[in-house]
Regions:
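Positively charged n-region of N-terminal signal peptides that target proteins for export
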Residues: 1-4
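Bacterial signal peptide processing site
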Residues: 21-22
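Bacterial N-terminal signal peptides
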Residues: 6-18
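Short active-site loop at a secondary-structure junction
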Residues: 39-47, 68-126, 164-177, 247-250
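Short, surface-exposed loop or secondary-structure junction motifs
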Residues: 66, 119-272
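Residue-level preference for non-acidic, small/hydrophobic
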Residues: 32, 36, 48, 54, ...
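Short, conserved catalytic-motif segment at the N-terminal edge
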Residues: 26-81, 101-106, 156, 161, ...
């Protein structure tokens, strides 16, 4: 993650979510407004939503989504979720498990034979739970190469290293590599690319109309909020890095209202289980 990017904050209530109400204007809150003061005004901004019993009790944008033209952040602004994206990758895998197309204890190499022999014992469950022992693909990238890598490039990088950080299942270590591989597994098991699968099975059914696993040249991000860094006394756009095009670990864009729909769906699922 690059520093000083535009902030996206979602604070969810602790009680069960019953549904997703239409957008409402909420009065100022001195406590929240005070916390968000650094993101208010003519600076890269943030969006905050607080839900209580599934209903929005606070929804507000602060600052700017696009510094160059002064576009303000609103509840509809779409931010890059970065690692918050991983929950959608995990959900896609579990949908395919329900479909009978994947098994949590299947070897990852069953779907990704390009992985080296050292990865033979890694299961899909271990990729999901950050216990695979995979190397971090960012450590394998050439620092002199400024081209963006994609999920398939992550597999290529890992295939060249016949070693792990530890034996699968013996330790926990947060793994971006694992979720990039899971996105590829979703594609191979479903017969559709990862972004299309998410649209068809998660985003569209839940009414998350503005959420997208973004691919330059393939789709666009509506009402997009960009990231910036303060360089030489001015805000300069630093929205994309060499790893921003990897979808499975961090490439999804979404808004407050769409994430409220996602939270409502998760809570309904939990309620149905009980």
């Amino acid at each position: 993650m690059r520093p000083a990017v535009a902030l996206f904050a979602v604070v969810l209530g602790l009680l069960p979510v019953a549904g997703c109400a239409a957008p409402v204007l909420t009065p100022p809150d001195a406590g929240i407004d005070g916390l968000m003061q650094a993101y208010d005004g003519q600076v890269p901004g943030a969006a905050v939503l607080v839900l209580h019993d599934g209903q929005p009790v606070f929804r507000r944008g602060y600052g700017l989504a696009v510094v160059e033209d002064g576009t303000a952040v609103t509840a509809a602004s779409n931010f890059r979720l970065a690692s918050v994206s991983k929950q959608f990758t995990a959900a896609a895998v579990l949908l395919l498990v329900e479909d009978g197309r994947l098994g949590l204890n299947q070897p990852a190499r069953q779907w990704l034979p390009e992985l080296p022999p050292a990865a033979a014992a890694i299961t899909i469950r271990q990729l999901l739970s950050h216990t695979s022992g995979l190397l971090d693909y960012e450590d394998l990238m050439d620092p002199a190469d400024t081209r963006q890598v994609h999920d398939a490039d992550v597999l290529t990088l890992l295939s060249r290293e016949d070693r792990l950080n530890f034996a699968p299942g013996t330790q926990y270590r947060y793994s971006n590599s694992g979720y990039a591989l899971l996105a590829l597994i979703v594609g191979r098991a479903s017969g559709k690319d990862y972004a299309t699968f998410l649209q068809e099975r998660i985003f569209r059914p839940l009414g998350m109309a503005h959420t997208v696993a973004h691919q330059d040249g393939v789709d666009t991000v509506a009402t997009r909020a960009y990231g910036y860094s303060r360089i030489d006394g001015r805000w300069q756009r630093t929205d994309q890095s060499t790893t921003s095009a990897v979808l499975g670990d961090g490439g999804i864009y979404s808004s407050l209202d769409d994430l409220a729909r996602w939270d409502a769906a998760l809570s309904r699922s939990r309620s149905e289980e009980h």
